[in-house]
Amino acid sequence: MFIIDDLFVSPFFSLLDILQTMALDEMYDTKSIRDDIKENQLLYEVGERSDEEYQQRKQALESQLEMAEQVQEQMRDRMEVKK
């Protein structure tokens, strides 16, 4: 009975794990957040953003980047090496 359960249920859970990993990778993409930080700085330097807008956006992006790095670190710790 348990062998049959493993045959049918294991692929389903594996698929859910893969989907969760892909969703987290997309939600917490550090490269895109770093690009947003650079864009924010560029807009400030060319005068399209006020100092207040720049500081608020910079602070929000930096906290978002910190969160993304923590999530990615947890994901790396969770990964298994499969042969």
Curated annotation (Swiss-Prot):
Proteins GvpF to GvpM might be involved in nucleating gas vesicle formation. A minor component of the gas vesicle. Gas vesicles are hollow, gas filled proteinaceous nanostructures found in several microbial planktonic microorganisms. They allow positioning of halobacteria at the optimal depth for growth in the poorly aerated, shallow brine pools of their habitat. This is Gas vesicle protein G1. GvpF to GvpM interact with each other in vitro, and may form multi-subunit complex(es). Might interact with GvpA1. Keywords: Gas vesicle, Plasmid. Induction: Part of a gvpF1-gvpG1-gvpH1-gvpI1-gvpJ1-gvpK1-gvpL1-gvpM1 operon, maximally expressed in early to mid log phase. Gas vesicles appear earlier when grown in static culture, possibly due to O(2)-limitation. Disruption phenotype: A single deletion produces very low levels of gas vesicles, in situ. Deletion of gvpG1-gvpH1-gvpI1 prevents gas vesicle formation, cells still express gvpA1. A single deletion yields fragile gas vesicles, upon complementation the gas vesicles are cylindrical not spindle-shaped, in H.volcanii. The keyword Ion transport does not apply. It comes from Halobacterium salinarum (strain ATCC 700922 / JCM 11081 / NRC-1) (Halobacterium halobium). One of its GO terms (cellular component) is gas vesicle. The keyword Membrane does not apply. InterPro entries: Gas_vesic_GvpG_halobact (IPR054797), GvpG (IPR007804).
